[in-house]
From Swiss-Prot:
Entry's Gene Ontology cellular component terms: cytoplasm
Function as written in the Swiss-Prot or TrEMBL entry: Involved in the catabolism of homogentisate (2,5-dihydroxyphenylacetate or 2,5-OH-PhAc), a central intermediate in the degradation of phenylalanine and tyrosine. Catalyzes the oxidative ring cleavage of the aromatic ring of homogentisate to yield maleylacetoacetate.
Chain positions recorded as homogentisate binding sites: 346, 367
Gene (name only): hmgA
Listed pathway(s): Amino-acid degradation; L-phenylalanine degradation; acetoacetate and fumarate from L-phenylalanine: step 4/6
Gene Ontology MF, one: homogentisate 1,2-dioxygenase activity
Active site: 288 (proton acceptor)
Enzyme class: oxidoreductase
EC number: 1.13.11.5
GO biological process: L-phenylalanine catabolic process; tyrosine catabolic process
Organism, scientific name: Pseudomonas entomophila (strain L48)
Name of this chain's protein: Homogentisate 1,2-dioxygenase
Pfam families associated with the record: HgmA_C, HgmA_N
Coiled-coil regions, chain positions: none
Keywords: Dioxygenase, Iron, Metal-binding, Oxidoreductase, Phenylalanine catabolism, Tyrosine catabolism
Length: 433
């Protein structure tokens, strides 16, 4: 069972909807988007998340009715303190795994605490993904937007309050949040410190996958995605606005809060989703199905069925397959797999893969259950059992993921990762079937 939505905040339910919300009655114009004089003396502004001529089913855009237009800002200047560079490290085909990254010792807000892990695209390209681990121990006092891509946040420790232009989201571990490219927001900590994962999607916006023969229900159901209601800040005084542009941080100083949208309508919206609401699909006969049945969100490419990025989870579930090796099978994959763990243990790894940690299996890197897991799975008396108190996830992408220089030099990189398979025995006997 899952908990009820927090009563402190209101949300709009659904995925891909044309939403509408207003913090003041009558703030939304009726029958048009850009009237000569908008209600309450507001400015009309369009935020486009896709090209104008995309098909309607894929179009993402939102009209904002705000106290001051976003164009009201001075020149952006490059910040002296830059994020850790996402420069890619040496090419390696090896399987990699990292222990959890430590929390920062110095005061660090959300945008200061990104550690680049892997990437497969330069920020200026409209495809690919960059993956980070974030760590923070103080709330943001500034506002941020990312011109380089859509952000998928996966908290592992610490609750976050995310104040966006369209309203406020609160997320905790086992929930995720998605922030559209270019949307301004501020992250406040609801606990002393926070850590988690970020997928920066440079490609097509994320959407829920088609269900095919599963039917009209299952996996992540649209009604469980929650978008905030309109909420605005009317303040005066200096506010730093930071943008990430081609991997660099640039900033300007405003004399007002840029989170001043009084009303809005459209489909280019931030949202949250509770992973505990995922309707898991699995076999009720034999064999382990392909992990695509665990897809929560996908960013497609022009090649049908091949994703720019998939977000896949491995949630609590019953294992009932008969006469079956039940862990995820040994695999060599065309896709590239970056995995993280939010809580518990992953059923293919008995040890070494910890909450807050990560692993990378690149294209055609052989992987699968470790020796201990394999031995148990082969010899166990099969009976229905539940994998519980766990939540692993995977960012899977069709382009090769290369680790960053920081990730390769990190003390948390496990030098002995390959050893988890080293004791797999040969049990072949040509005289015994």
């Amino acid at each position: 069972m899952t908990r009820d939505t927090s009563p402190q905040l209101q949300y709009l339910s659904g995925f891909g909807n044309e939403f509408a919300s207003e913090a003041l009655p009558g703030a939304l114009p009726v029958g048009q988007n850009s009237p000569q004089k908008a209600p309450y003396g507001l400015y009309a502004e369009l935020l486009s998340g896709t090209a104008f001529t995309m098909t309607r089913s894929e179009l993402r855009r939102t009209w904002l009715y705000r106290i001051r237009p976003s164009a009201l800002h001075p020149r952006f200047e490059r910040l002296e303190r830059q994020p850790l560079t996402g420069a890619l490290g040496a090419i390696t085909p090896n399987r990699l795994r990292w222990s959890p990254q430590p929390m920062p010792a110095e005061p660090t807000d959300f945008i200061e605490g990104w550690l680049p892990m892997v990437a497969n695209s330069a920020s200026e390209k409209p495809a690919g993904v960059s993956i980070y681990i974030y760590r923070a121990n103080r709330s943001m006092e500034r506002v941020f937007f990312n011109a380089d891509g859509e952000l998928l946040l996966v908290p592992e420790q610490g609750r976050l309050r995310i104040a966006t232009e369209l309203g406020v989201l609160e997320v905790e571990p086992l929930e995720i949040a998605v922030i559209p490219r270019g949307m301004k927001f501020r992250v406040e900590l609801l606990d002393d410190q926070a850590r988690g994962y970020i997928a920066e999607n440079h490609g097509a916006p994320l959407r829920i996958p088609d269900l095919g023969p599963i039917g009209s229900n299952g996996l992540a159901n649209p009604r469980d995605f929650l978008t905030p209601v309109a909420h605005y800040e009317e303040t005066s005084g200096p506010v730093q606005l930071v943008q990430k542009f081609l991997g660099e941080h640039w900033a300007c100083e405003l004399q007002h809060s840029p989170l001043d949208v009084v009303a809005w309508h459209g489909s280019n919206v931030p949202y949250k989703y509770d992973l505990r609401r995922f309707n898991t699909i699995g076999t009720v006969s034999f064999d382990h199905p392909d992990p695509s049945i665990f897809t929560v969100l996908t960013s497609p490419t022009s090649v049908h069925g091949m994703a720019n990025m998939d977000f896949v989870i491995f949630p609590p579930r019953w294992m009932v397959a008969e006469n079956t090796f039940r862990p995820p099978w040994f695999h060599r994959n065309l896709m590239n797999e970056f995995m993280g763990l939010i809580q518990g243990a992953y059923d293919a790894k008995a040890e070494g893969f910890l909450p807050g940690g990560a692993s990378l299996h690149g294209v055609m890197s052989a992987h699968g259950p470790d020796a201990e897991t394999c031995d148990k799975a082969i010899s166990v008396d099969l009976a229905p059992h539940k994998i519980d108190n766990t939540m692993a996830f995977m960012f899977e992408t069709s382009q090769v993921l290369r680790p960053s220089r920081q990730a390769l030099e990190s003390p948390q990189l496990q030098a002995d990762y390959d050893s988890c398979w080293a004791t797999l025995p040969s049990t072949f006997n040509p005289n015994r079937r």
